[in-house]
C-alpha cells in the first residue's frame, strides 16, 4: 500500500518496445572533469582503469552473457535478464589483478543490485581473476553522480539520455576491445503495477502510452519514483506530451 493506493498486481507487462529496460556499462575516464557535490572541480582522482577494463571485458564474454541470460530461471521460473541483440562479445585476454588494480569500484542501479545478478556473477569474476569489486547502488541519477564525483571506476546503469550526457560531458572512455563508450548488453522489461480492480482500464490498453494516457485522463493516482533514477526517467517519457511533464 502506497499513499492509500493498494498496489497488488502487475497489470501491464512486456506490452511493447516502450517497456524495454536496457542496461549499459561505461568505463570512467581518469581525465574527466570531476566535481564535488557543490560542483567544484576535484583534482587527483584515482581511477582503476585496468580493473574496470577487466570487469567490462568479462561481462561481455560469451560465458558471462550466458550466465546472465539464464540467471533467475531456476529459482523463479522466469528469465530476469536477456542478452541484447548485437551486444559485442569479448574474446581477448583479461588481465588478472595486481596489488595496484585489485579493488574495482562499481556504481550501479538498485534494480541491478536488488535483482541478485551481481551477487551471482561477481564471486565468479573475483575468484577467477583475483579482484575485489566494491558495489554501491542507487538510482541511475545518483549512480552516475557517484562517478562524476570520482567515486567509481565504472558504472552499470539503465537510462540512455543520462548515459549519453555522461559521455558528452567527458566522463566516459572506450575500453580495449570495444568501439563505443556506452556498451549496452542486457535488457529486461519495465512493468506497470497497480490495484487489481484496474480503475483506469490499463489491462485493455493497446500500448503503455495508451495506458499512461488513460491514467492521466482519468486523473487516477500514480506513484512515481521521482528520484532521477532510470525508472523515473522512463516514466517521464511515457506521459502524454500535452501534459508537459
Q: For the regions a protein language model found, what residue spans apply to each?
A:
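Acidic, polar ligand-binding/catalytic clefts
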Residues: 154-187
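Short Pro/Gly-enriched coil loops immediately N-terminal to beta-strands
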Residues: 16-21, 175-197, 208
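Exported/periplasmic ABC-transporter solute-binding proteins
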Residues: 1-132, 141, 145, 151, ...
Amino acid at each position: 500500500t502506497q499513499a492509500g493506493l493498494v498496489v497488488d498486481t502487475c497489470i501491464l507487462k512486456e506490452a511493447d518496445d516502450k517497456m524495454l529496460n536496457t542496461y549499459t556499462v561505461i568505463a570512467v575516464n581518469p581525465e574527466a572533469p570531476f566535481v564535488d557535490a557543490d560542483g567544484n572541480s576535484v583534482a587527483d582522482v584515482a581511477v582503476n582503469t585496468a580493473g574496470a577494463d577487466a570487469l567490462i571485458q568479462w561481462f561481455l564474454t560469451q560465458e558471462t552473457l550466458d550466465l546472465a541470460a539464464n540467471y533467475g530461471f531456476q529459482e523463479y521460473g522466469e528469465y530476469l535478464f536477456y542478452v541484447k541483440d548485437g551486444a559485442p562479445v569479448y574474446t581477448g585476454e583479461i588481465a588478472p589483478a595486481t596489488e595496484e588494480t585489485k579493488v574495482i569500484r562499481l556504481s550501479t542501479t538498485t534494480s541491478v543490485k536488488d535483482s541478485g545478478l551481481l551477487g551471482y556473477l561477481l564471486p565468479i569474476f573475483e575468484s577467477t581473476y583475483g579482484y575485489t569489486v566494491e558495489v554501491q547502488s542507487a538510482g541511475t541519477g545518483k549512480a552516475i553522480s557517484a562517478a562524476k564525483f570520482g567515486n567509481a571506476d565504472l558504472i552499470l546503469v539503465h537510462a540512455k539520455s543520462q548515459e549519453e550526457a555522461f559521455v558528452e560531458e567527458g566522463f566516459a572512455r572506450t575500453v580495449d576491445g570495444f568501439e563505443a563508450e556506452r556498451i549496452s548488453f542486457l535488457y529486461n522489461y519495465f512493468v506497470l503495477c497497480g490495484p487489481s480492480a484496474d480503475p483506469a482500464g490499463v489491462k485493455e490498453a493497446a500500448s503503455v502510452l495508451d495506458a499512461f494516457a488513460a491514467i492521466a485522463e482519468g486523473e487516477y493516482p500514480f506513484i512515481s519514483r521521482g528520484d532521477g533514477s532510470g525508472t523515473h526517467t522512463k516514466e517521464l517519457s511515457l506521459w502524454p506530451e500535452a501534459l508537459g511533464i
